[in-house]
């Protein structure tokens, strides 16, 4: 499976790391991080990230899924012709596009929301202002899935993650996202398999030998 995550100035990694973590750790997926330029981008959390490829370098590459985080610097990316051009070339009949928070606006400008229901963390004044955002198709719901286009409000990142995983056909245990108000000590006691424990002991031994040397 080929999956891309888009980066831009002040992108919100917090909104997508539940999803990206599950894709990598639970399903062994490798993600391509894409951006307009090959440079360091600073997320809204202050983390510095470097893309694997620029949009130009992946022209012609077909992704199974493209993930867009929100951003605090909305207009920097909205008027970035390289980002919008990349999105315009996405075939949403083949590619699942998942955008959260403010990033559905990028889909709108690229024409990917035309005649589709959507949501997002968008101010209604901006929905009124930009004609590419079809107000009659905006649903005030945490997550909206219309065929291969998934959009969400920022706080709904867990449901967003579930929806993307389901659409990709990646199944998790039914209680994976469940949280309780009380946990017994037994539920919070963890043990290794014997074979895994032996591997860890070997690794510890290697580190301890290095320190002694």
Question: What kind of region is each of these model predictions?
Answer:
Residues 2-12, 21, 25-38, 47, ...:
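Active-site-adjacent pocket-lining segments in enzyme domains
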Residues 11-16, 42:
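Short N-terminal binding/cap micro-motifs at the start of the first secondary-structure element
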């Amino acid at each position: 499976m080929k999956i891309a995550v888009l980066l831009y100035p002040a992108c919100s990694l917090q909104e997508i790391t539940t999803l990206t973590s599950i894709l990598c750790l639970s399903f062994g997926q490798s993600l391509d991080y894409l951006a307009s330029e090959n440079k360091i981008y600073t997320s809204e959390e202050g983390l510095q990230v470097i893309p694997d490829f620029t949009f130009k370098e992946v022209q012609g590459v077909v992704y199974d899924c493209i993930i867009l985080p929100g951003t605090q610097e909305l207009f920097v990316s909205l008027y970035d012709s390289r980002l919008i051009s990349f999105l315009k070339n996405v075939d949403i009949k083949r590619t699942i596009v998942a955008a959260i928070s403010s990033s559905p606006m990028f889909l709108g400008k690229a024409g990917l929301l035309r005649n589709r229901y959507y949501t997002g963390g968008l101010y209604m004044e901006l929905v009124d202002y930009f004609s590419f955002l079809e107000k009659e198709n905006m649903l005030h719901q945490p997550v909206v899935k219309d065929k291969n286009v998934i959009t969400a409000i920022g706080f709904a990142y867990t449901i967003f993650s579930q929806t993307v995983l389901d659409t990709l056909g990646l199944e998790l245990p039914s209680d994976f996202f469940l949280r309780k108000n009380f946990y017994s000590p037994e539920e919070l006691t963890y043990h290794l398999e014997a074979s895994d424990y032996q591997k860890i002991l070997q690794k510890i031994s290697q580190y301890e030998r290095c320190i002694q040397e």
